[in-house]
UniProtKB/Swiss-Prot annotation:
It comes from Methanocaldococcus jannaschii (strain ATCC 43067 / DSM 2661 / JAL-1 / JCM 10045 / NBRC 100440). Belongs to the peptidase M50B family. One of its GO terms (biological process) is proteolysis. It is found in: Cell membrane. The active site is at residue 50. Its EC number is 3.4.24.-. This is Putative zinc metalloprotease MJ0611. Binds 1 zinc ion per subunit. Its main location: membrane. Pfam families: Peptidase_M50. One of its GO terms (cellular component) is plasma membrane. Its cofactor is Zn(2+).
Length: 191
């Protein structure tokens, strides 16, 4: 299955999920500008994270496709609107193959958080290039922090997160990738 082939349902699910996530991250200070910053910074992190899982799974001969979890999106809206809490559980890439080795499963899982790290680097470059206070500078700051946060969150070593699959496959790789990212995530949460 080609990595560039998307079903109509997958396109709809990805679109609805990314718009919902952008809204959740832009509320309560919602404006078109804040929404656009959120869409670029958070939306790109979410989309590329999920599509990298999908791409690596297809490399291993598995059928894979993103499916939205509409209940999770609704819960995210309710928690944000009622309590001001940010919760995102937009869906996941569903993977089907008769058998995936622990190594294949671990590499599929690791692909998402590593993509967020790569995106964080790109956003960091934006922060360095553009003048503080400019739109691209703010996109850079938000994109840098949120992508490292997403990578750390996904590397938690508990099901259903990516970190659990990586740890089962290779504890050393989980430690050198996951621990710094989880540390950064915790720093962001409590600093």
């Amino acid at each position: 299955m080609s990595i560039f082939r998307f079903s109509q349902r997958e396109i709809i699910d990805l679109t609805i999920s990314v718009l919902a996530i952008a809204f959740i991250f832009s509320y309560p200070n919602f404006s078109i500008l804040v929404f656009i910053i959120s869409l670029i910074a958070v939306g790109s992190g979410f989309i590329f994270h999920e599509l990298m899982h999908r791409t690596v799974a297809r490399k291993y001969g598995a059928w894979s496709e993103f499916r939205a979890w509409y209940e999770g999106l609704i819960l995210g809206f309710i928690l944000k609107l009622v309590f001001g809490a940010t919760f995102i559980a937009p869906g996941a890439v569903y993977i089907y193959k008769d058998y995936l080795t622990p190594e294949e499963n671990g590499k599929i899982a690791l692909a998402g958080p590593l993509t967020n790290v790569a995106l964080a680097f790109v956003f960091f470059i934006l922060m360095l290039i553009f003048k503080p206070g400019s739109l691209l500078y703010w996109i850079g700051i938000f994109g840098f922090h949120i992508n490292l946060f997403l990578a750390g969150f996904n590397m938690l070593p508990i099901p259903p997160f990516d970190g659990e699959k990586v740890l089962k496959w290779n504890p050393f790789i989980w430690a050198i990738v996951g621990l710094p990212l989880i540390g950064y995530m915790l720093y962001m949460m409590f600093w």
